[in-house]
Amino acid sequence: ALSVVYPTEEDTAVYGPLAQMDYETWNKWVEFVGKKGGYGSDLAANGTVKNQEELDNIIGKYAYGYNVVAGRVNYRDEIKLANGGAAGGYVGSMQTGTITNGQAYQAKTIKGLRCAGGFAGEMINGGAAKLGGVDILGLNLQLGQMLQVLNVFVPVIKKSSVEGYQSGLIVQSEGVDNKNICGYAGGYVGKLIGGQIWGENDARCKVTKLRRVDGRSYVGGFVGSSRPGSVATLNPTAGEGLLSQLLNKLLSTPADLIKVLNATVATIRYADVEAWDDWGIIVNGAYASGSNNTSYAKAAGGFAGNLEGTVLGKKDTEKAGVSVQNIRSVVAGEYAGGCFGVADVAGVANISAGNETSLLDKLLKLGRTDVLDAFRSYVYYGTVSGSKDAGL
């Protein structure tokens, strides 16, 4: 029943205005609309064309990319409003589903209050605890069924990329609040919780022609913040707490719990960040505050601002690694790095927000130190290069 409502998209793309215009349609427009003056008269002055190449040369002078803006300017902690303020070049907020070979071209400026990303504003393994009239938390599921339920709520992006406009893609998340809910910005995705981003050797997940990323909490050239789906420090108002509730049912069976935890780890493979120009990419966490002082985001990195329980690349598979090219500068208040600002495990120690059950303590008392692997972050075959013009 869950799979019935599982959204999937394959082989789709987003373009800026005038892109993909074919020359036959162009000629008809010139003949019946453009030559009569008024709207588009400067375009129509080019006249009809004989082939697609001629048209592409004309449109290349006028194609101006597209902007995405999530318009809310103030955050409000209410169910109807908590999910607003997420902007992405392809998708704003992705709470489940799979996107395969989705492409975004000519993205110019992506701006959101809570989070912004060149491809996706946020990827969250969320969804309602009650779906289709079935109370998932009340079901008596075997482990295999439980894993299937978890997978339904894990968002996956495969072989999908975003290409910036010719003058470079700018990603901005300038919301400020006192709970670190706003201000997540990444060249590809702003906020990632338990999601999977998987490219392939011949179809990597890339953000190209990136110029700058600005955020006020966590900022990264590829991802602002990446965390596992088992974290307890989620925002239940925004529907982020389902997996923690499911995992809480398994606290008494550590062996099963470890398998489920591994299913919630965020993974990014075959992923790249490329600059718009040799001038390089700026990852910026500095901003002017109301008191005319300079304030800073907590963490920023050339690839990721914050990593928790995340695996970048793939063990023993060099080509599955991640790369950042042409980073010019990375600025943050507490943590800044060429690859990542901070990689931490603290956020996943408590799984039950109600009574603060310490999952880590419970498992360590049982001698299950192997569970620590589900909490650590790993980087396999990651590379960073500075700006060709000015270095890093």
What role is predicted for each listed range?
Residues 1-392:
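Surface-exposed loop/turn motifs in large extracellular/passenger domains
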